[in-house]
UniProtKB/Swiss-Prot annotation:
HAMAP family: NDP_kinase. Its cofactor is Mg(2+). It catalyses: a 2'-deoxyribonucleoside 5'-diphosphate + ATP = a 2'-deoxyribonucleoside 5'-triphosphate + ADP; a ribonucleoside 5'-diphosphate + ATP = a ribonucleoside 5'-triphosphate + ADP. The lineage of its organism: Bacteria, Bacillati, Cyanobacteriota, Cyanophyceae, Synechococcales. Its EC number is 2.7.4.6. One of its GO terms (biological process) is CTP biosynthetic process. Belongs to the NDK family. The active site is at H117. This is Nucleoside diphosphate kinase. Its main location: cytoplasm. Gene3D superfamilies: Nucleoside diphosphate kinase-like domain (3.30.70.141).
Amino acid sequence: MIKERTFLAIKPDGVQRGYVSDIIGRFEKKGFKLVGLKQLIPTKQLAQDHYGVHRERPFFKDLVEFISSGPVVAMIWEGEGVILSARKLIGATKPLEAEPGTIRGDLAIDIGRNIIHGSDGEETAKFEINLWFNQDEICDWETSDSEWRAEN
């Protein structure tokens, strides 16, 4: 069985405001498996590489400055449908458009401080996982309750 994985990053505002355990808990409760986790202050180069698709946009410089301004909690989550489910759990990019019950709908107000980043598709997830993690930082393990999470 191919395991779907996605990359998530709790941004400096989410770390500073103390939302790390709440956010991790939401994904654990949903039934996803955490296979990569680290906290770091991203270099400007890492931030530029991560947000390279926005390089020509007017907000690029501010985005790079913000993401490299403090600690980020980088994560790899695994599970069936994890990419789409994570996007739904995170909510709309603009927090004021995010539904209540989503991370951004519950915890964020401003688009420039929207708490969390999540991969938007399979190719992006692969790119971001490889950008932020070395292979030896990914822990491939089996949960003891996997038979209770989804039909095989």
